């Protein structure tokens, strides 16, 4: 393991003190502006809004020059009882090229016994090289796809016994959590959401029930499309940090269909309904994330005009890594 120079220190924290949060978010914003991609997932950013998950660990890397400067941040989640702990990290652009990312990952590995899953958002060359150098293998690949919302959209076709309506906060919460669990039974990161996870997102400034669509059959929820808008026309903050630094962008945030309603074309219909809504908001483009191994979903999105835009990679060391795209 690399011995840290005297001018560099790595501090582990549980919840972060409120005074530290602006410094972390400023670092994240700086990296986002430089790289053109968010270095942290929404899950981590949401927890940071509240000081971090008390079950997780936040590591701060400081460089002590004339005064302490925050040069790196990492979030470590070791709560999964089966999988290796997972981490996400970011190094301030002004401090890159000094091996600080390697130091931060090695500090995390020392806490996890050498087992770790590590997300690299945007597939940046430096992150890829560091992962290979430290003995990580690709475990999963997420594709970001985008579409021009000004391009024509096909009509919505639904079975006669299915209706689409919008989400009713409070009234639909429990039923949606149950549907989400059924729809993502094979994807525990999404399917294990609790009411707290739902309510935390409902408290975000971007939450809009008018863009949260539910498919209902015989009084039962059988599918949904939750849309999201990144940024705002006024350039105001819509996440835990500052503005996004780009024009507003729509997202197919979560799309799910009850397994017993598969084959009815609900995924396609719900996608089109959401895209029409985002276009009504005068948004020029829409994005989504999809697992690289989910061929049916990729075919659906490509048939609706989406094209590959970027890639996020989950690396693993000391686990069961077996190639790309394990879901």
Curated annotation (Swiss-Prot):
One of its GO terms (molecular function) is mycothiol synthase activity. Acetyl-CoA 2 binds at residues 255-257, 262-268, 294-299. Belongs to the acetyltransferase family. MshD subfamily. GO terms for biological process: mycothiol biosynthetic process. It comes from the Bacteria. 1D-myo-inositol 2-(L-cysteinylamino)-2-deoxy-alpha-D-glucopyranoside binds at residues 42, 189, 228, 251, 289. It comes from Acidothermus cellulolyticus (strain ATCC 43068 / DSM 8971 / 11B). Its EC number is 2.3.1.189. Keywords: Acyltransferase, Repeat, Transferase. Residues 11-159, 162-327 form the N-acetyltransferase domain. The lineage of its organism: Bacteria, Bacillati, Actinomycetota, Actinomycetes, Acidothermales. This is Mycothiol acetyltransferase. PANTHER family: AMINOALKYLPHOSPHONATE N-ACETYLTRANSFERASE-RELATED (PTHR43877:SF2), AMINOALKYLPHOSPHONATE N-ACETYLTRANSFERASE-RELATED-RELATED (PTHR43877). InterPro entries: Acyl_CoA_acyltransferase, Bact_Acetyltransf, GNAT_dom, Mycothiol_AcTrfase. It holds the Pfam family Acetyltransf_1. Acetyl-CoA 1 binds at residues 89-91. Monomer. SUPFAM superfamilies: Acyl-CoA N-acyltransferases (Nat). It catalyses: 1D-myo-inositol 2-(L-cysteinylamino)-2-deoxy-alpha-D-glucopyranoside + acetyl-CoA = mycothiol + CoA + H(+). Catalyzes the transfer of acetyl from acetyl-CoA to desacetylmycothiol (Cys-GlcN-Ins) to form mycothiol.
């Amino acid at each position: 393991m690399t011995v840290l120079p005297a001018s560099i220190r790595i501090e582990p924290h549980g919840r972060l003190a409120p005074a530290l949060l602006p410094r972390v978010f400023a670092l994240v914003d700086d990296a986002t502006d430089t790289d053109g991609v968010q270095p942290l997932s929404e899950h981590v950013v949401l927890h940071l809004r509240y000081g971090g998950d008390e079950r997780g660990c936040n590591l701060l890397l400081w460089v002590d020059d004339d005064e302490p400067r925050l040069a790196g941040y990492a979030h470590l989640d070791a709560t999964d009882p089966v999988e290796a702990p997972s981490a996400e990290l970011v190094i301030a652009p002004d401090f890159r090229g000094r091996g600080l990312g390697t130091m931060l990952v090695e500090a995390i590995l020392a806490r996890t016994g050498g087992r770790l899953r590590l997300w690299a958002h945007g597939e940046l060359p430096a992150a890829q090289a560091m992962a290979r150098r430290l003995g990580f293998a690709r475990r999963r690949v997420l594709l970001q796809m985008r579409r021009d919302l000004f391009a024509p959209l096909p009509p919505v076709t639904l079975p006669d016994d299915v209706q689409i309506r919008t989400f009713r906060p409070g009234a639909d919460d429990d039923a949606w959590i149950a549907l989400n669990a059924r729809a993502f039974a094979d994807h525990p990161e999404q399917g294990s959401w609790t009411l707290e996870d739902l309510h935390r997102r409902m408290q975000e400034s971007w939450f809009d029930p008018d863009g949260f669509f539910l498919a209902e059959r015989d009084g039962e929820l059988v599918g949904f499309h939750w849309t999201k808008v990144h940024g705002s026309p006024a350039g105001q903050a819509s996440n835990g940090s500052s503005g996004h630094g780009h024009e507003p962008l729509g997202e197919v945030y979560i799309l799910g269909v009850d397994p017993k309603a598969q084959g009815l074309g609900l995924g396609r219909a719900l996608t089109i309904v959401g895209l029409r809504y985002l276009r009504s908001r005068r948004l020029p483009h829409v994005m989504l994330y999809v697992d690289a191994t989910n061929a049916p979903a990729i075919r659906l999105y490509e048939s609706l005009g989406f094209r590959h835009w970027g890639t996020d990679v989950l690396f693993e060391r000391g686990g069961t890594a077996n190639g790309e795209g394990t879901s």
